[in-house]
Amino acid sequence: MAEAHQAVAFQFTVTPDGVDFRLSREALRHIYLSGINSWKKRLIRIKNGILRGVYPGSPTSWLVVVMATVGSNYCKVDISMGLVDCIQRCLPERYGHFGTPQTEALLSMVIFSTGVWATGIFFFRQTLKLLLSYHGWMFEMHSKTSHATKIWAICVRLLSSRRPMLYSFQTSLPKLPVPSVPATIHRYLDSVRPLLDDEAYYRMETLAKEFQDKTAPRLQKYLVLKSWWATNYVSDWWEEYVYLRSRSPLMVNSNYYAMDFVLIKNTNVQAARLGNAVHAMIMYRRKLDREEIKPVMALGMVPMCSYQMERMFNTTRIPGKETDLLQHLSESRHVAVYHKGRFFKVWLYEGSRLLKPRDLEMQFQRILDDPSPPQPGEEKLAALTAGGRVEWAEARQTFFSSGKNKMSLDAIERAAFFVTLDEDSHCYNPDDETSLSLYGKALLHGNCYNRWFDKSFTLISCKNGLLGLNTEHSWADAPIIGHLWEFVLGTDTFHLGYTETGHCVGEPNTTLPPPQRLPWDIPEQCREAIENSYQVAKALADDVELYCFQFLPFGKGLIKKCRTSPDAFVQIALQLAHFRDKGKFCLTYEASMTRMFREGRTETVRSCTNESAAFVQAMMKGSHKKQDLQDLFRKASEKHQNMYRLAMTGAGIDRHLFCLYIVSKYLGVSSPFLAEVLSEPWSLSTSQIPQFQICMFDPKQYPNHLGAGGGFGPVADDGYGVSYMIAGENTMFFHISSKYSSSETNAQRFGNHIRQALLDIAELFKISKTDS
């Protein structure tokens, strides 16, 4: 096969005349170019490391300081106050021709200038860290900014005015603070008050007070100690104990999905759309490696932590019997592709040159045209990644630790990411309510064996050119993959484009070797393990009810007429909808980010509050005046916004209690309070999907260029998972998941309640689409 010759640099055979070596010049050329490319990347990393290390300074500023010192010395002005002379006296004795007094004086001035420059950088960086520790601006109304906040904003802008690289602010970000135990306990009790009757609340209050007085002080000391030496006192434990140690299937339980633009279509040619998307992703990876991506900034000046972006590509979750492992490679030059039960390896480079979209389209089309059947056991192989983690770890160790199976598995696990060429078509038809839900189901779990759920993300290509992502959760949270996805969709639409016939622009290089088919030798025992995992995954997938819909009456623009945040508006509507659906309040999880702190990930906002419960109960009674309902709504909204701000600034509830629980386990300390808190089910798990993190186009000029967001599976057996995207000024998308096996839940019924709740709250403020 042609690809085999490309992969081998030389061959040799033993003959009666000796050993005959046959060199492949083309293969050696590729190896040489690959080595050159690798060294280029290393040099870029070294350069970026230097530039990042001296931020907010620069090599230019160092040169200015040196020139100022030398110039002042030339003018007989000693700005060093004798330090240059002191440094000169401390230099080793002069040797040879170059050890002249002038040379030593110049060297002393350079050393002095470098010290002054480095001291200035340290001072500016510590000052910036101190400034970024101030979060008072989050709790102020935009129209009532204090003088302190205005001065703070000016100082931050001055210290971060130079164009930053992706990781320039990492060492200037403050550490996540450890809240005080009494504050956390107080906020916890306040959060569960609307969920408990008086007797249950008194019992919980007693447990909390006992914990606060007896057990918590010791646990808190250890946690504070960890916060002093660890970069982030939460993130490593969160990654390990919440994600990597979970033995449940990743599919549905952990992985989540992201949708394509659904209101426009760029092309119907599957291979062409995929060619553009893969090319755009590797362009993004190149920018990531070179740190050319701008860090995400709140208000355009407060940097967010970029740590999670490091493991976006070349990353796989490796199964283990007790805990999984995240394997991240510094480089990968290929993608793994699945189509009709077969696995392929597709190179992304020719030598050191990234393949053009048209070349990638040709490679993917070759796979689509390949008529070869799957090898025995190959078709459902990926079901191992969809089933239990222990079973997959055992099968991997037994059947994939040597030979061609190991080689092929390495090709998948060491790929930049995983690609699947689906045989089904999906699209969003506003007249067909089920179309968006079917598309979401396909992205969430597919047929249980056409996604490699262990990869950092799987790029899914439908037959009609529609795209989607399935993302593993442990390495990063949704805003990170959302940043990549916005870049890909924007680059595909506005920069790469297509010909009139729907193909990628340009002419393909037909001399490229075809994709390499991955060989397998899967014994009968392994096939049984694959089938068992498939049955587990299929039962899980069949039990998921997913209801996705577009809410058309209004969006962010008209919500602002209520003088509240769009997120608070939706969260209160969810509380009203849930009460109408089940007749009771429940523990509600909303994901908030803590990326204003170094290596921060998420915190929980407990959206069911006393204030939101009071509003819901008043709405249910139907006897209150509209003005009273408006007042109750505003109180609930203000409470929600305040809780969200507290969570973002490190004063949340659940991560603190989670870490105290981990410390108690390490110390062997029993805590009935922590055990009960950590076992409480989240019957309503919610998340807002971010958008427009990166400016690729003007949404006002292109209002139909909207993704539909994404979603996840239900967290509790009798609960709902709800994700929503407030997509611009005039519309919203909702993704609701539940389990068919639960008699308490129905995703479509809950979706209808959400629709009505949004309309009812809007009616309180007489908001209609005609008001815009």
Curated annotation (Swiss-Prot):
It is found in: Mitochondrion outer membrane. GO terms for molecular function: carnitine O-palmitoyltransferase activity. Pathway: Lipid metabolism; fatty acid beta-oxidation. Its EC number is 2.3.1.21. It catalyses: (R)-carnitine + hexadecanoyl-CoA = O-hexadecanoyl-(R)-carnitine + CoA. (R)-carnitine binds at residues 589, 602. The keyword Ion transport does not apply. The keyword Lipid metabolism applies. Residues 1-47, 123-772 are cytoplasmic. One of its GO terms (cellular component) is mitochondrial outer membrane. CoA binds at residues 555-567. Residues 74-102 are mitochondrial intermembrane. It is a multi-pass membrane protein. Keywords: Acyltransferase, Fatty acid metabolism, Lipid metabolism, Membrane, Mitochondrion, Mitochondrion outer membrane, Transferase, Transmembrane, Transmembrane helix, Transport. Catalyzes the transfer of the acyl group of long-chain fatty acid-CoA conjugates onto carnitine, an essential step for the mitochondrial uptake of long-chain fatty acids and their subsequent beta-oxidation in the mitochondrion. Belongs to the carnitine/choline acetyltransferase family. This is Carnitine O-palmitoyltransferase 1, muscle isoform. It comes from Mus musculus (Mouse). The gene is Cpt1b.
